[in-house]
Amino acid sequence: MEWSEVEVHTTNEAVEPVANVLTEFGAAGVSIEDVADFLREREDKFGEIYALRREDYPEDGVIIKAYFLKTTEFVEQIPEIEQTLKNLSTFDIPLGKFQFVVNDVDDEEWATAWKKYYHPVQITDRITIVPSWESYTPSANEIIIELDPGMAFGTGTHPTTQLCIRALSDYLQPGDEVIDVGTGSGVLSIASAKLGAKSILATDLDEIATRAAEENITLNKTEHIITVKQNNLLQDINKTDVDIVVANILAEVILLFPEDVYKALKPGGIFIASGIIEDKAKVVEEALKKAGLVIEKMEQQGDWVAIISKRGVE
């Protein structure tokens, strides 16, 4: 089989939306090459899996590589893929210098190339995301989430995902009922299950994402707790007693359903909203307040913001 590698040079802020677009067009795998991963300090327990060279990484920005089976349909879609990525700037997502290149690769090369850039990611002092092919010995009480990033984007490396998982760690109580809106790879649902949630509904509009989530959920043996549903946000989700709603999606999408979140939450229930670029935080905050939610706190990592809000106790 012949494969094509789509290489996009962009900003760190654009990583998640760019990778999501590539996945939605049918990418079989996505890798992220960020110099920050090379330069940041790491604990010894991650060991030799970090034996990489500085020249493996771009001088600035981030390179995202996605792998597609080279079919006539894919070749015809290349201009559409490039234009869709460029259109992300209309959502105030900074694309930086933005370079879009398509290369041919052989079967063996694509199947392994992205793996060298994906490593265990320690999100909190007790939650670590580990590639499914890596052997990893957890410390006492450490929670391990296994993911295969070849299935869909959502590996835990992006600040928005990390902000969500940290908020879940802070607010989720054993026995809680959770809805994960825009589940992607299912990482937030899996984290919720491993933190003790009683039941989780994971929704995503994209069929590729729901299939990927189901595979990762099975990999983590949490399928008895998590139900995956292809669905548009919270439409036709007739729940009114949910403890936590979590959504790691763009600010423009979050603005579409604060009222539905309010209706779904029980009094005192928590809404964790991430995927919000700093410039959009204020407008999201105001929309949440208008829907009747009370802002608990805001957390920031780089240019990304998570807003934690609550339905008041009536």
From Swiss-Prot:
S-adenosyl-L-methionine binds at residues 161, 182, 204, 248. GO terms for cellular component: cytoplasm. Pfam families: PrmA. It is an enzyme of class 2 (transferase). The keyword Transport does not apply. Keywords: Cytoplasm, Methyltransferase, S-adenosyl-L-methionine, Transferase. It is found in: Cytoplasm. PANTHER family: ELECTRON TRANSFER FLAVOPROTEIN BETA SUBUNIT LYSINE METHYLTRANSFERASE. Methylates ribosomal protein L11. This is Ribosomal protein L11 methyltransferase.
